Amino acid sequence: MSGHSKWSTIKCKKEKTDNARAKVFTKIGRELAVAIREGGPDPDNNSKLKDVIAKAKAANIPNDNIERAIKKAAGEDSSKEYIENVYEGYGPNGIAVIVETLTDNKNRTAGDVRHYFDKYGGNLGQSGCVSFMFERCGVILIDREDEDENVVDEDTLMEAALEAGAEDFLTEDDTVFEIRTAVPDLGAVRDSLEAAGYKFSTAEIQYVPSTYVKLTDEESLKNMAKMIEMFEDNDDVQNVWHNWENPEDAEDLI
């Protein structure tokens, strides 16, 4: 879940492997456990759980797997508590990086995060050092063609999204429509669009960069791609957000 929508080329390709799918399921399983601990196992009475379930469905996790994970999380020993932390820092050439973690061992995770920054030409910063470069908002992505290859009508979708409470409707990407919401409104907008028959490929809270930085030299491209890969391979890391403009240029280098 690195970067932001159209800048996530590397991640999207990596997630097609079975190993990456297993990683995604492990990470979402932790989010389910936290949501259930905080609000119980009924999604109708637990908006956070409902959001995580929607995220799991968008990641193509089968309903049976989601239900089993919920039952497992509801019956788990509550002594195993996951702690949410957000780390901020810089990648090569000043790329802004935000790392969201969910861990049962804060010291282990902090050490890993610092190591990845240091190893690949970046540095871990103080809280707030880069977050001002991002807007935290709800993001819903809907494919321009549905599962039956029918073209989704732009005007109809835009009207439905704005009526549901969306703040912005973006059409720059050739493959998806991007709908942005205020953080508290994500669930309501998503549910309204789902009720209208739309299927989404992403529906989550994201850090959206206000500006992007382009890398040009091969070493920086390699280091930035490898840094993101290491973060995403760590089970404690839930999301990595950055303002790297051209991750696709590193595809053939790693």
How should these model regions be labeled?
Residues M1-D143, D185, H242:
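N-terminal cationic and glycine-rich segments that engage phosphates or anionic surfaces
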Residues D143-I254:
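Positively charged, low-complexity, intrinsically disordered RNA-binding extensions
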